Amino acid sequence: MKFILLLLAVTLTVSVFSQKTESYYDFYWKPCSKENASYFSIVQKTDSGWLRTDYYYRSGQLQMDALYEDEACKVQTGHCYYYHANGRPSATGRRVNGKNEGICLSYYSNGMTSDSANFQNGLVVDKRFRWHTNGFPYDSTSRLNDSLYVRVSWFDDGSPSSAGYMVFDKPEGKWQYFHHNGQRAALEIYNDGKLVGAEYFDESGKLIQDTSGVNRESSFKGGEEAWRKYLQKNLHWPQRLEFKTAAAVTIGVDFVVDENGKVINAEVWMPFHEEFDKIALKVIKNSPPWLPAISHNRKVKAFRRQPVTFTWGEE
């Protein structure tokens, strides 16, 4: 009998470990070889579901720890933990059938809280608060009933930015937007999330007639092609670092284009190797001026996430 029980225990142990899979992914989370990996993933079957742990491959730092209902890891269940490359928490919360449940929190890489809300079946219960990277409030959303919310937002210096109502996460009715000096910049009317009427004002409060430029994305002067050429011209493969075969290395850099078009707050969010990281960060920081973003008739800061790719062994 002891022999049978021992054999059974060994069989179960082998069975458990046989359901553990390891995978490598590139910068874009596509399966790849070990040499070109940015992430490393382990998926293991447990009594509660499929436990997935993702790591930043080069550093070994944990990127995610979460439980899934399915082997394909599409539907999260239970507590989930995410981390920045520097080891600080990125997000934490609980999922039920893939939807947020209970208090969920998000954090910037500097450790400041970026988002806090209480969820029920994926919907915000009562209030939601978000913050800028410097700790100033970004916006506040309050639930008035099952479908109606009121949202107020601020610039990162604490001055009012906007206010209005949301119905099922779509703007509804009258929305007001403000310049940094407190003057109203825009009065917009929405119906089921669609803009149906608007008036725009300059910083002195005067109504403006030409509304063609009240919204635009931040952009590099000369467009995407000029930006690509700038990166190609200034990037170089680090000295004394060689690959045996042709390879591509991608670094992830976050930065902000401020109201004057200057690149600020650049940081590496997806590192590869210290020498590559330094070069990528320097190129982004030394960028020529951009055209700043305009949102609801105000120049605003714009967040950008830029993949920076180095190639080896190619013409």
Regions inferred by a protein language model and the residue ranges of each:
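Extracellular and select intracellular beta-sandwich modules with Ser/Thr-enriched
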Residues: 302-304
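Bacterial Sec-dependent N-terminal signal peptides
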Residues: 1-24, 231
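Glycine/tyrosine- and acidic-biased, solvent-exposed loop/turn segments at the edges of beta-strands
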Residues: 19-263, 267-299, 311-315
